[in-house]
Design a protein with these regions (language model features):
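Short, structured active-site-proximal loop/turn typified by the sulfatase FGly-forming signature C/S-X-P-X-R
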Residues: 18-54, 58-62, 105
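His/Asp/Glu-rich, glycine-adjacent segments
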Residues: 60-202, 284, 299, 308
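Active-site neighborhoods of enzymes that stabilize oxyanions during catalysis
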Residues: 273-397
């Protein structure tokens, strides 16, 4: 029997959340029948887009190339999200599946825009200004959703975005529609709770319980869609996450330090016209770019001297960060003190008490909580429990189930879970 596989990423789901979710019917059903990894260690940085690239490729960021949620744009503190798949530098699971002639689908998975090897594609569109049906249709078609797929699976559920402002409900509904109608061989789904609620309320607030209830409803709907597809006997389902979060109390703006030390050139309106060093936030860490390598010792000394004033516990050199699997063309990485998140602004104080955000991530994966992995279906040994694994272990394991190859993967196959 050929295996089919659905991988659901519930963003920032903690292992500890299972105590609450185990009281819910669908999670109780899953927990009583699944193979499980109790605690999965994430990658550095513990940030959504790099994490999902690692989940899709089995590689660390220094190899797959996605090191942030947003593009590096010096002088611009706004977010330019990495929508498109061309950010990847290695083969992912969807590529591998198409090489074997399998059908593929993805809904809400970061950086899948215009992916050439996803048959049923609904990209994650973050920070869009769209508010109407037509504006959302434009954005989704722009990122690779075929018009006929929009009409069949997106349009019937777009009210979740236009009226309820719920990307979560839209993604879950569209994915279930795809499973019911087309029963693809490989499906990836990303839903943004409980991450969104933890950002707003902190990691342990009772206000995140409605987000966990949404996760229960999502699982209920997916299980029903699998039954409705007519392929219940061949489908495997994985429910997991990408990272966890920590509570934050302060915001750090290293670019303010650079501006005060003439490493940024500003015009009379305070806009950046040139830069020698630029800090790009990765949440509770930040990558520091140095335009001219001869300035690197000056920038390093300045940052080292001001680590406490920036809410940092340490600074990684390029070589040290690469040893953590986190490397691109930046020179340094600033790591949080465990209470501070970073922003790109240069016109604010270097360190201020937190305002809006109460929880965040992007920190080194040795910090904070871990997330679970629950797997059910004919490919998995019911009742098997592994105490831990690594985020990069998922993709090579899913590749083995699907009968495809990921030769670049850094992770290892979780043989103990498989039949």
């Amino acid at each position: 029997m050929a295996h089919k596989l659905i991988v659901v990423s519930m963003d920032a789901l903690f292992a500890e959340d299972l105590a609450y979710l185990s009281q819910k019917p669908s999670f109780a059903y899953l927990l009583n029948r699944c193979a499980m990894v109790q605690k999965v260690k994430s990658i550095y940085p513990t940030l959504t887009y790099p994490c999902h690239a690692s989940m899709a490729t089995g590689c660390f960021p220094k190899k797959h190339g996605v090191v942030n949620n947003t593009h590096f744009v010096p002088g611009d503190a706004s977010s330019h999200w990495i929508w498109y798949h061309d950010a990847y530098r290695v083969k992912d699971l969807h590529d591998a599946c198409k090489e074997k002639g399998l059908t593929t689908a993805s809904v809400g998975w970061p950086s899948t825009g215009k992916h050439p090897h996803i048959d049923y594609l609904v990209d994650e569109i973050a920070a869009t200004k769209a508010t109407t049906d037509e504006e959302f249709r434009h954005d989704y078609l722009l990122t690779g959703t075929p018009p006929e797929l929009w009409d069949a699976v997106c349009a019937p559920h777009i009210h979740f975005r236009t009226q309820e402002r719920s990307v979560f409900k839209f993604n879950a509904a569209a994915c279930c529609e795809i499973i019911r109608r087309y029963a693809p061989d490989f499906v990836t789904l990303h839903v943004g709770e409980p991450d969104h609620s933890r950002h707003l309320y902190g990691i342990s607030s009772e206000q995140i319980l409605p987000a966990l209830d949404l996760c229960e409803q999502c699982l209920t709907d997916i299980l029903q869609a699998i039954r409705d597809s007519g392929h219940e006997e061949s489908y495997n389902l994985v429910v997991t996450a990408d990272h966890c979060q920590m509570d934050v109390t302060h915001t750090s703006c290293p670019n303010a330090l650079f501006a005060a030390n003439n490493l940024l050139t500003l015009d009379t309106d305070g806009k950046v016209t040139d830069w020698r060093a630029w800090s790009h936030s990765t949440g509770m860490s930040a990558t520091v770019y140095v335009k001219d390598s001869t300035d690197a010792p000056v920038v390093y000394a300045l940052l080292k001297k001001n680590l406490p004033q920036l809410g940092c516990s340490r600074i990684y050199t390029q070589e040290e960060a690469a040893a953590e699997g986190f490397s691109r063309n930046f020179s340094f990485v600033l790591e949080t003190d465990g209470h501070t998140r970073f922003e790109d602004h240069w016109d604010q104080p270097p360190l201020t008490p937190i305002g809006r955000t109460k929880g965040s991530h992007g920190f080194h994966p040795e910090k904070g909580h871990r997330h679970p992995l629950l797997a059910i279906g004919p490919a998995f040994i019911e009742g098997t429990i592994l105490p831990e694994s690594h985020l990069t272990d998922g993709a090579p394991t899913w590749a083995k189930i699907l009968g495809v190859s990921l030769p670049d993967a850094d992770g290892h196959i979780l043989e103990e879970l498989l039949t």
